[in-house]
From Swiss-Prot:
Role according to the record: Catalyzes the enolization of 2,3-diketo-5-methylthiopentyl-1-phosphate (DK-MTP-1-P) into 2-hydroxy-3-keto-5-methylthiopentenyl-1-phosphate (HK-MTPenyl-1-P).
Cofactor: binding comment: Binds 1 Mg(2+) ion per subunit.
Cofactor(s) in the UniProt record: Mg(2+)
Modified residue annotations for N6-carboxylysine: 166
UniProt entry keywords in alphabetical sequence: Amino-acid biosynthesis, Isomerase, Magnesium, Metal-binding, Methionine biosynthesis
Active site location: 91
Sequence similarity: Belongs to the RuBisCO large chain family. Type IV subfamily.
Organism: Bacillus licheniformis (strain ATCC 14580 / DSM 13 / JCM 2505 / CCUG 7422 / NBRC 12200 / NCIMB 9375 / NCTC 10341 / NRRL NRS-1264 / Gibson 46)
Name of this protein: 2,3-diketo-5-methylthiopentyl-1-phosphate enolase
Quaternary structure and partners: Homodimer.
Reaction catalysed by this enzyme: 5-methylsulfanyl-2,3-dioxopentyl phosphate = 2-hydroxy-5-methylsulfanyl-3-oxopent-1-enyl phosphate
Pathway as given in its UniProt record: Amino-acid biosynthesis; L-methionine biosynthesis via salvage pathway; L-methionine from S-methyl-5-thio-alpha-D-ribose 1-phosphate: step 3/6
Length: 405
């Protein structure tokens, strides 16, 4: 019988963590057990949850807690993420200090999920870069700007050598810069930049609107030649992401933005672990990219949480790996540390670290590319800066984060 394993962290589980775990296992499956007649117990046995493990520990704050793993028969729910979450964490999420830390799916259940269409290798193949972290930049200050302003931003970022450019997640459908026009006009700008530089740049356009409208809009984006779709996954739901990944008429990579996820992950006592929501479930539902706060920037996660997301995005599984995108407050002086912690297969994502460069967005992009090259070539960053005026200016403005051995 196939089972799904759910691991929880119970803060202050009471005097008997084993008893609390058993209450959860029974309460979220057959409802009661000891009061049932033997015949009914036999009939319901295959639907009964079971406690796999209970480990009592202390939190980092010295609080008593228990890590509990419960097995749920997959016969109890349909093979979709909403059914799973409702089963293992529906009413339970309302029942005191309890956090869903992980889900372990059976191989048969995984076969019903799409995973990324392109994954790390597919994205690299589109860009033609395989031996370094990719570089992404973000539109900045876009509210109230017209199409000409956005086109110039796009052009300057592309000339700086970035591999991907994404819309701001708060750029919605506007009269001055409508969705379809951003795709068609942006495509022209990037083609012109390619002719000038010989470097391929992909543009992630923000897919927004009412849920019922999104599929038609995504299909139209594909027809118009869009490169990538940016989706605020947790404003819409993982099932919406999955529906795009499964649709053959939407043959585009999907970039999952973490907007709203903080309300679901940030508490130590409630909600989901960062790695489950932004790592595993994003990947399983079909995200080719997963953005999340880096451990170093302006909206930082603890390093263990950021690395756990990266691990869920990239570790061996039946699905293609998702490109991990640690973000927020990234500048060129952080790149050696980013590459030490996240290796080659991640995307360096910068906003102000590119647009705030003294030589503009193009200079910001060149500074990032220079420091990436320095790390790959094992050249001291200060030596590289002597031959890269843009990197020198960036280090003077933002400084450098030291890498401990």
């Amino acid at each position: 019988m196939s089972e799904l394993l759910a691991t929880y962290i119970l803060a202050d589980p009471g005097c008997d963590a084993e008893k609390r775990a058993e209450q959860i296992a029974i309460g979220l499956t057959v409802g009661s057990w000891t009061d049932l007649p033997l015949l009914k117990q036999e009939q319901l046995k295959k639907h009964k949850g079971r406690v796999v493990n209970v480990e009592e520990t202390e939190s980092e704050l010295g609080e008593k807690q228990a890590t509990v793993t419960i097995a749920y028969p997959e016969a109890n729910f349909t093979n979709d993420i909403p059914a799973v979450l409702t089963t293992v964490f529906g009413k339970l999420s309302l029942d005191g200090k309890i956090k869903l830390a992980d889900l372990e799916f059976s191989r048969s259940f995984k076969q019903s999920l799409p995973g990324p269409k392109f994954g790390v290798y597919g994205i690299r193949k589109k860009i033609g870069e395989f031996e370094r972290p990719l570089l992404m930049s973000i539109f900045k200050g876009v509210i109230g700007r017209d199409m000409e302003d956005l086109k110039e931003q796009l052009r300057q970022q592309a000339l700086g050598g970035v591999d991907l450019i994404k819309d701001d997640e708060i750029l919605f459908e506007t009269g001055s810069a409508p969705f379809e026009k951003r795709i068609t006009e942006g495509k022209k700008v990037l083609e012109e930049a390619f002719e000038e530089t010989g470097r391929k740049t992909l543009y992630a356009v923000n897919l927004t609107g009412r849920t019922m409208e999104l599929k038609a809009k995504a299909r139209k984006a594909a027809e118009l030649g869009a490169d990538v779709l940016l989706l605020n996954v947790f404003a819409y739901g993982l099932d919406v992401l999955q529906s795009f990944a499964e649709d053959d008429d939407i043959p585009l990579p999907i970039m999952a933005h973490p907007a709203v996820s903080g309300a679901l992950t940030s508490s130590p006592h409630y909600g989901f672990s960062h790695s489950l929501l932004l790592g595993k479930l994003n990947r399983y539902a079909g995200a080719d990219f997963s953005l999340f706060p880096s451990p170093y920037g302006s909206v930082a996660l603890p390093k263990r949480d950021a690395l756990a997301i990266y691990d869920e995005c990239t570790k061996e599984d039946v699905f293609k790996p998702t490109f991990a995108v640690p973000s927020a407050g990234i500048h060129p002086g952080m790149v050696p540390l980013l590459m030490k912690d996240f290796g080659i297969d991640h995307i360096i994502n910068a906003g102000g670290g590119i647009h705030g460069h003294p030589n503009g967005a193009a200079g910001g992009g060149r500074a990032f590319r220079a420091v990436i090259d320095a790390v790959l070539e094992a050249e001291p960053v200060e030596e590289k800066a002597k031959r890269s005026p843009d990197l020198k200016l960036a280090l003077e403005k933002w400084g450098r984060v030291e890498v401990s051995v």
